[in-house]
């Protein structure tokens, strides 16, 4: 058995490539059907992600949403939630309002106005200069982590990232780290790619270059690579047992 944790956008799912989506989903189904565990780990919230999983019939064993602030099992029971500190939100909001930023608070499922039930502040922006300016305005002002993605600036609790979320999941579910493989393409995948065995997508954020990871053209390619390793190990064990017998 193997455990694969995969980023969602531009790794599993592509808005502009239905053929690649289809091949990835078929590979995921084969991977799970062989008794392996497949975890989707994303910056999206649960409701947003679940829409695409249902629409495209994408199976999973676990979901890690909001960059690790929410963890769910295969029946969508929430195993873990990490909230933003309300006092930090009170510092963040005036800065964003003064900057006239387009933003919202996210409770892990939907937009919220409740500072006591917020896992992420999301600022909408596709402008690289504007995103950098927002990060510079807000960094080092509280106990939170702020980073820019393709279309947003994201603010989460500073105890949250994808690597830490995987460690929590493995502790909760008593899973074996030696079975884990990871794949991603963006800056929020950095920590898990640095600390676990895995690969990056060929088209990836430049920060991931410093990790010097193997590159693959698709999730499908990596899944079949892992399944081939499993088969080779099973054959090897069979012959060891056969000759001992």
Q: How would you describe each model-predicted region?
A:
Residues 56-59, 67, 141-142, 194-196, ...:
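Short, structured coil segments at secondary-structure junctions
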Residues 19-109:
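Active-site phosphate-binding/coordination module
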Residues 11, 46, 188:
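Conserved Rossmann-like nucleotide-cofactor binding loop
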Residues 2-17:
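Asp-based phosphoryl-transfer active-site loop
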Residues 14-18, 40-41, 81, 158-159, ...:
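Short, flexible loop segments at the rims of nucleotide/cofactor-binding pockets, characterized by
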Residues 95-195, 203:
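Conserved acidic, metal-coordinating active-site core of Asp-based
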């Amino acid at each position: 058995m193997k455990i694969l944790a995969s980023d969602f956008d531009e790794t599993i799912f592509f808005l502009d490539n239905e053929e690649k989506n289809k091949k990835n989903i078929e590979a995921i189904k084969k991977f799970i059907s062989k008794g392996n565990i497949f975890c989707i780990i994303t910056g999206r919230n649960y409701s947003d992600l679940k829409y695409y999983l249902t629409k495209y019939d994408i199976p999973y064993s676990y979901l890690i949403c909001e960059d690790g602030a929410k963890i769910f099992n295969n029946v969508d029971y929430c195993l873990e939630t990490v909230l933003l500190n309300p006092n930090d939100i009170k510092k963040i909001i005036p800065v964003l309002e003064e900057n006239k930023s387009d933003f919202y608070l996210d409770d892990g499922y939907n937009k919220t106005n409740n500072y006591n039930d917020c896992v992420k502040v999301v600022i909408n922006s596709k402008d690289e200069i504007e995103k950098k300016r927002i990060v510079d305005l807000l960094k080092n002002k509280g106990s939170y982590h702020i980073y820019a993605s393709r279309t947003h600036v994201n603010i989460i609790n500073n105890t949250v990232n994808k690597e830490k979320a995987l460690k929590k999941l493995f502790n909760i579910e008593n899973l074996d780290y030696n079975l884990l493989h990871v794949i991603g393409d963006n800056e929020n995948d950095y920590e898990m790619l640095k600390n676990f065995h895995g690969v990056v997508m060929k088209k990836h954020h430049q920060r991931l270059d410093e990790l010097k990871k193997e590159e693959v053209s698709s999730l499908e390619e990596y899944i079949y690579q892992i399944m081939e390793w499993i088969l080779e190990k099973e054959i090897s064990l069979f012959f060891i047992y056969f000759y001992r017998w």
